[in-house]
C-alpha cells in the first residue's frame, strides 16, 4: 500500500506558506536539479535573460520566490525552470464538450517525487487553482476566467534548450483568458522537452497543442491525448507505450452517446487508463476534472473526492491510500 499526502494552501502572493514549501522540498529538488552535475544547468545570468526575453511578466514573481528561498544562486536557477533536468509524467487527458465543458485528466507519476500541493493564488492579479510542481510550476489548473490547462509527456526523447512546460502553464494561467491566447504562448516560448498540452475555456473553445524542442508547436482539435505526438507514433519510453490503448479506451467513451461526464471520469478511474501506483513504483496519483463554467476542480480517487474552486477554496490536508485491491467508491454525480 502507498500513502500520498495532498495539501491545499491559499496564498495570494508568495509568502510564508510557499517559503515553508521551499524549505521542506529544497533538499530533494536540489538533488534532482544537480543530478547531471551543476555544469549541465544554465547560469543565473542566462536564466534571468531567458525569463526576461520570453516570460517577462513573471520576473517579479520569480524574484520574490528567489528572495523567499534565501537569494542563493542555485535556488534562483532552479526556480527559473529554464533548462532543468528532463522529467516524464505519463498522464492521459480528455476534453468533454457536451453540457459542460470539462477537462479530465490522470496524472501518472512516482509518489515519492510528487509534491501533492494544491495551490490557490493570484500572483499577478488573476486567481488560479493549480496542482503545483517545483514550487510554482503547474501540472494542471484553472484560472478565474475559466481557462483550464493540463500536460502529458509527449513520448519523444529529444531534449533541447527551453523552459519546463510547468512554468509556461503558470504563465498561461496568469496572463491568458482564452484558448487562442494560450496557443499563441505555446507557439512562441521554447520548451525543453516534448509535451502535449490540453486547453479548454468556459465557452468550450479547445485545443491540444504538441510542443517539442526540435520542431514548431502543432495545434490540433483532438479531444484525447496521452503520450505520443502523432496518431501512428510509438512513444520512445517503454513505460508509456500503452498510449494508443489508453487513448482508444477514452475515445470510445467520448463517442458513446449514452455516456455522460460521470461515465468519462469513471473510465479514468478504471484500468487501463488508471494505473496502479503499487505496480511499478509509479502510477495514477489523481484524476482531475476541471469545470470551466464553474471555475472548479474536482479531484477524484477510487475511494473519494475533493472539490476545490476559485471561489470557496478549502485549505487542508488529505492522505490518499492506494491499495492494489481498492474498490471504487459510488460514482460522483456530474450534471
Per-segment meaning from a language model:
Residues 1-71, 81, 98-335:
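C-terminal, well-structured catalytic/ligand-binding subdomain of enzymes
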Residues 74-95:
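Short, glycine/charge-rich beta-strand/loop segments that flank catalytic centers
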